[in-house]
Amino acid sequence: MSSEHQTFERIHALLPRGAGHQFVLYGDTCSGVSGGLHERTFAAVNAVVRRLVPSPDFIVFTGDEIVGLTADPEQLRAQWQHWLAHEMGWLDRQTIPVWHATSNHTTYNEMSEAMFRDVLNMPRNGPPGQEGLSYWVRRGDLLVIFVHTGWSGLGGEGHVETEWLQGVLTQHADARHKLVVGHHPVYPINGFSGSYQREIGPEHAATFWAILVDAGVLAYICGHILAFDVQVHRGVLQICTAGAGTAHRMPDGVEYLHCVQAVLDSEGLRYQVLDETGLVRERLEWPIRRLPAERWHTVPAGESRALLTGRLGPGRFVAFRFTGQAAAEGTNHAQTLLSAFSPGILAPLWIGVRGPRQILTAIIGGQPGRSPHYWHGAELQPGARFDLHLLAYGDMGPGGILYRFGDSGRWSSLVAASATGPERLDWPERWSVGHAQGGLTDRRFLGPALTVSAAIC
């Protein structure tokens, strides 16, 4: 990184606890045009990256560097040249390597794929036909695999190869840290959804994610949806960073320009999300630490004083454990596990099961007069015993309502179409277990047994 960054006000980078890796994730600038709007917004985010002390070991760019999407190869090459020589000219790429993911603005046909190979010269260790498009990098105990989520040889946007991915993960099974990078998400973000155009197509998605889970991948890092988002599915994080300069938000009023500074060490992953002014807007430590037994408290059946009021601050979460037996088959009613409320207002939080499939559901109310947002998870099997753990983790935004079964199960985020989550919830002063705020007959739990405990961290 150029020494010029020393004149900026420094931003202290997170550092590994002992040996590890310190790096930056960002993407989606749609620039490469001199004097364009996105050139200015990208410069603002780059100014933040340049203030990081110490500088990152490497940078992962999740795609859409340039506006692209042109049939003219010379125009496309000129955009790449402007982006590399002028917009990223401050960076010493020999000292701080940058690895790029393919994307819909940069690799949209065979011509643009060839251009990507030529101008970026990424490693040529990918599957046949995808050399320089899909590839892997090994740095000590870290493996980073880049997958092409729009290969022309497989069908274009939203299509991704999986056999090679599985082979590379098997070959490098000894890597302590495994990251996979691709442009398109697998799981919808902020309610913006659509197979192929916004996520990897359904004929690939399940196999793709199962490979990540089975190989012990820590995170799939993506972009495309103009937001920062984190969620977890079967223990694997999906981290979306797509705010490096494109002057649109998904949605406006919630999302913001940003970059992500992250570290990996023997204890896991930590990151901080910095906006274009250098302010830390979001952060996370993963995996979730196990809570000691003394943190857990039984929540009595019926109505009681809440164990938590107000908002969850950074790093804080609420853990619930629900044990019992599900209602019999044929039960269709909404059934309450726990409700949090204040007298005279609709409960801002309801946790329970709904419908004939007894689907785990969390409902968070927002502003008065506005519809609440719904999160959906697994089904409870009729009449079966269950040991359900549920977490409200403000640092994960809309991905921060998580569940698992048993102490050793893998965490998964409940699915939602919201751009916000428990971080905006003002926890009220009353809780009720086994029924909702209206009393004993209000959406009561219909199984023969239910016990609840909670821990605040």
Model-derived regions, located:
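N-terminal active-site segment of His-dependent metallophosphoesterases
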Residues: M1-R77, I189
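Extended active-site neighborhood of metal-dependent phosphoesterases/phosphodiesterases
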Residues: S2-I11, T70-H177, S195-A219, A227-D265, ...
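A general structural motif
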Residues: G20, P56, T95, D174-H177, ...
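Residue-level marker for buried hydrophobic side chains located in beta-strands
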Residues: F23-L25, I59-F61, H100, V180, ...
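Active-site glycine-centered loops adjacent to acidic/histidine catalytic or metal-binding residues
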Residues: D28, G63-D64, S103-N104, H183, ...
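Short acidic, glycine-rich surface-loop motifs adjacent to enzyme active sites
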Residues: H172-G191
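A short C-terminal boundary segment appended to hydrolase-like catalytic domains
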Residues: V263-G315
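Extracellular glycan-associated modules
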Residues: P292-C457
